[in-house]
From Swiss-Prot:
<comment type="function">
    <text>Catalyzes the rate-limiting step of the oxidative pentose-phosphate pathway, which represents a route for the dissimilation of carbohydrates besides glycolysis. The main function of this enzyme is to provide reducing power (NADPH) and pentose phosphates for fatty acid and nucleic acid synthesis.</text>
</comment>
<keyword id="KW-0313">Glucose metabolism</keyword>
<keyword id="KW-0521">NADP</keyword>
<feature type="binding site">
    <location>
        <begin position="7"/>
        <end position="14"/>
    </location>
    <ligand>
        <name>NADP(+) 1</name>
    </ligand>
</feature>
<feature type="active site" description="Proton acceptor">
    <location>
        <position position="198"/>
    </location>
</feature>
<protein>
    <recommendedName>
        <fullName>Glucose-6-phosphate 1-dehydrogenase</fullName>
        <ecNumber>1.1.1.49</ecNumber>
    </recommendedName>
</protein>
<feature type="binding site">
    <location>
        <position position="175"/>
    </location>
    <ligand>
        <name>D-glucose 6-phosphate</name>
    </ligand>
</feature>
<dbReference type="GO" id="GO:0006006">
    <property type="term" value="P:glucose metabolic process"/>
</dbReference>
<dbReference type="InterPro" id="IPR036291">
    <property type="entry name" value="NAD(P)-bd_dom_sf"/>
</dbReference>
<dbReference type="GO" id="GO:0004345">
    <property type="term" value="F:glucose-6-phosphate dehydrogenase activity"/>
</dbReference>
<feature type="binding site">
    <location>
        <position position="193"/>
    </location>
    <ligand>
        <name>D-glucose 6-phosphate</name>
    </ligand>
</feature>
<keyword id="KW-0119">Carbohydrate metabolism</keyword>
<feature type="binding site">
    <location>
        <begin position="137"/>
        <end position="141"/>
    </location>
    <ligand>
        <name>D-glucose 6-phosphate</name>
    </ligand>
</feature>
<comment type="similarity">
    <text>Belongs to the glucose-6-phosphate dehydrogenase family.</text>
</comment>
<feature type="binding site">
    <location>
        <position position="112"/>
    </location>
    <ligand>
        <name>NADP(+) 1</name>
    </ligand>
</feature>
<dbReference type="Pfam" id="PF00479">
    <property type="entry name" value="G6PD_N"/>
</dbReference>
<feature type="binding site">
    <location>
        <position position="286"/>
    </location>
    <ligand>
        <name>NADP(+) 2</name>
    </ligand>
</feature>
Amino acid sequence: MKVVIFGSSGDLAKRKLFPALSRIDLEGVGVVGYARTKYNIEFSEVLQEVGNYSPEFLSKVTYIPGPYDDLSKLKEVSDSETVLYFSVPSSVYTCLFREISKLDYKVIGVEKPYGDSIESFMEIKGFDLGKTRFIDHYLLKPLVVAMPGIIRETGAIREVMSNRYVKSVEIVSKEVLGGEGRHYFDKNGIIRDMVLSHMGELLGVVASDVTKPSRIMEALARMEVFKACTVDTERCIYGQYDDYIKEIHKDSSTETFCMVPISIGTPRWSKVPFIIVAGKGMNEKRTEIILEFRRDVFAKCIELFSMPRQSSCRIVHTNEIETVRLVFNIYPECEVFLEVLVGGEPVRYVLHDKKEIDGLMHDSYGGYHDYEIIFDSLVRGKDFSSVSSQEAELLWKVFNPILSISKEDMLFYYSKGIDMPKEAEEMIREIKDH
């Protein structure tokens, strides 16, 4: 049995895919790297330049240089027990799917973005995808795995997850890392890189109503959310941090920051703005979903969550409360908490902590995480959360209105290392107060 990594000379393969493969049980499994790059040193040396690997793992790895429009070198390698994994530019996908149809294989894993446009995705959809899994590793983050069950089984949380209580929902991803050396990012931008996949899936998870513990039901529920989503294109804003052009050594109108408001046309979420915020070159790495409650239900929220009305120093009266938020912090805390703002100071009440969430994650996937789960599942034929072609198509349809336009004349510029651009803060306030 073999795992073939297409694009094995790339950043993702070297930073995440090969390290994940080295941490799972690969007894009886060989690993083949395939890419256009020709090396004048052993591929094992290439891998060791960016990671630490055991001699046992490196002995399993071979490397084949070759083009993506001619996979004849793989005919002797790939058989009905071979896992194929796409970690190549999405512009290559159509060509690669065409060539792979000439090979035997067990299953294909496909990295996001699934194509470089909605048109190219529809071309991909025209191939036989019966043995293809579209991958989004955010669906395998511990809190994202646990979230449907937490919402379903925590009475207070389930009660407040609707427009009867919620004023707005922010889905936020902040990264310190910029675009340094990443030509892939400059071609795609933050919307195609993050929003079309990871942030869209987080929206689907938090807004869906899953009544039974089933991955199929969870996926269907996300799809129902996406069918009802509309992007407010007039209020979207796009930014680029001020050092970006210097870092990539060329002029660019690629957005490194975006704020995307979305409405969900269902009775449950009608008139609640969902605001996706994603940025690189920020002051911290943080991923979280923030549900802000309406002022008229503050007291009810405090009662529902049985939150003590006493901070560390004094009693908190309802009329002193400025804001009440329910936060699903995916990173770095990995916990669910209620946050009450009193006198400008937040009082936090943890509802589900990291230890509990890690336990729920272990119940679902054992001791593996992220790409370890993906490769172990593909190799062993196990079920795991992934994206169907129908779900991927719906996400393309939701975000295509802002993916298909030039943003060159729309960009604002922000300082690298900022907490949040003032342009985004002002627009978020305007949307919430509308």
